[in-house]
A protein has these predicted regions:
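Surface-exposed, low-hydrophobicity segments enriched in Gly/Pro/acidic/Ser residues
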Residues: 1-451
Length: 451
């Protein structure tokens, strides 16, 4: 799914974008122009086939007049005896069994004895300053090895790339200086461990009376990152739970209805799932950077609903990560209809503190339209003001920014079928300059929409 400014857009040649799988590209259609003011998020799933994998899922439901229950399970397990991308030797299996979940330990020497072949890059072993190293050799009388070199980072290895040719690259040993490695390659091969992910979920709803609705969900996960090893298995199991209660305070079918809503999410740090739990911009909404620990998301609010006139919702949210984050957010949403007037407003204000930053984030989007029989006119006002400061010196971070935009538009036709709409948008962008948020540019956009 592709999101623009947090909203999903449609895929297709006659819609917003297409995907070229051969080139690995997302191409936006000419009917969906991209500007520098847009935030683009691509949400996708992939699976690496390193072992034969067995996937099983299923579920069941139970329902009565007041109670609904659902149970589902999901399991994906790599067969550790059926590798697809690597042939593991007994020595390499032993390395994996001692590595636990630490990928930095999942490496093995890559040198393999090889007979002389003029079409291959081969190495011999040689003592250099008391260290046994691989040295490029073309002498058929030497004991030769085929060696794979892995990039390990600057000053993390003892080999450097000295020559590239049509057959293969040639690497050369460089002795450490004062104990500091001088290369960025090592004669190792990274081993990939078989994994397991299992999920069990039970959810349901209970309606003890006409005015009360209760929804609940509990899930457990088991995520083993190395089936060859029992080390580090203490963090395999995780739990997540959700409870939502809606209580109708005033309930009349043809009039305004008032409800109170309480919602609680608990997610342990070790809980794993196969897809995201929240919206694509959850981290941006809360100014999250690197949250750690168990998560608690608590919310409470009021919902005012009228069958013909729309709704208004106020919600207070509290988000906590046990090790380094605490935040509170107020949300106000309204979508109302008064004869020919339509009013929409979505605003929020966030205050949070982490071990690194504190921030205040104000957001507001508002739209008012007036409809004629086959025409409409309207205006929009949107603003954001995001100030993030580092705890250590109270300076603004580069993510601090602010904007305001004003828009007017008019259209004719049926906005859900065939229509033409023209409009004008003025936007002012502010960004960080010399530790101050200052105006950096303005834009004026004239547009025509049609269908």
């Amino acid at each position: 799914t592709v999101y623009v400014n947090g909203l999903p857009i449609k895929r297709g040649e006659s819609e917003d974008y297409i995907i070229d799988y051969n080139a690995g590209e997302i191409i936006f259609n000419s009917t969906f122009p991209i500007t520098s003011e847009m935030r683009i998020t691509v949400d996708y799933q992939f699976s690496e086939r390193n072992f034969s994998r067995f996937t099983v899922f299923g579920g069941s439901n139970y329902e009565t007049e007041k109670l609904k229950l659902g149970v589902s399970v999901y399991s994906e397990i790599d067969s550790k005896n059926q590798p697809l991308q690597q042939n593991l030797s007994p020595e390499q299996v032993a390395i994996l069994s001692n590595a636990g979940d630490d990928e930095s330990l999942m490496v093995a020497p890559s040198g393999v004895p090889e007979v002389y072949n003029e079409n291959r890059i081969l190495y011999k072993k040689e003592l250099i300053d008391g260290v046994e190293a691989f040295v490029f050799s073309t002498n058929p009388e030497d004991e030769l090895f085929s060696v794979k070199f892995q990039a390990v980072g600057e000053n993390q290895g003892d080999y450097i790339l000295v020559n590239s040719n049509a057959i293969n690259n040639i690497y050369e040993y460089v002795a450490p200086i004062a104990g500091v490695p001088q290369g960025n390659f090592a004669p190792i091969v990274r081993l990939i461990a078989p994994e397991k992910l299992q999920l069990a979920v039970i959810n349901g709803s209970y309606r003890p009376s006409e005015k009360t609705d209760i929804y609940f969900e509990a899930a457990g996960s088991k995520n083993d990152l190395n089936l060859f090893s029992s080390l580090d298995d203490a963090n395999n199991d995780g739990f997540a739970g959700k409870l939502r209660v809606k209580q109708n305070i005033i309930k009349k079918d043809s009039l305004w209805n008032l409800s109170a809503i309480v919602d609680a999410d608990l997610i342990q740090e070790n809980f794993k799932t196969i897809q995201r739990l929240y919206n694509a911009e959850f981290n941006r909404d809360w100014n999250l950077e690197s949250p750690r620990g168990d998560q608690q998301l608590l919310s409470a609010g009021l919902e005012l609903l009228h069958p013909q006139k729309g709704l208004a919702i106020y919600k207070f949210e509290h988000l906590n990560f046990s090790e380094n984050f605490n935040g509170n957010r107020h949300n106000l949403l309204a979508s109302l209809r008064f004869n020919r007037w339509n009013v929409f407003s979505n605003s929020s204000i966030l205050n949070n503190q982490s071990d690194v930053t504190t921030s205040t984030f104000l957001r507001s989007f508002n739209r008012v339209t007036y409809s004629f029989d086959k025409q409409w006119i309207g205006t929009k006002l949107a603003t954001e003001d995001n100030e993030q400061r580092t705890v250590s010196n109270d300076s603004l971070t580069p993510l601090s920014q602010r904007f305001k935009s004003y828009e007017i538009f008019t259209g004719i036709g049926d906005s859900t079928k065939v229509f033409v709409e023209v409009g004008y948008k003025h936007r002012v962008n502010d960004s960080l300059r010399l530790n101050r948020i200052e105006k950096v540019n303005t834009s004026n956009t004239y547009y025509v929409k049609s269908k």
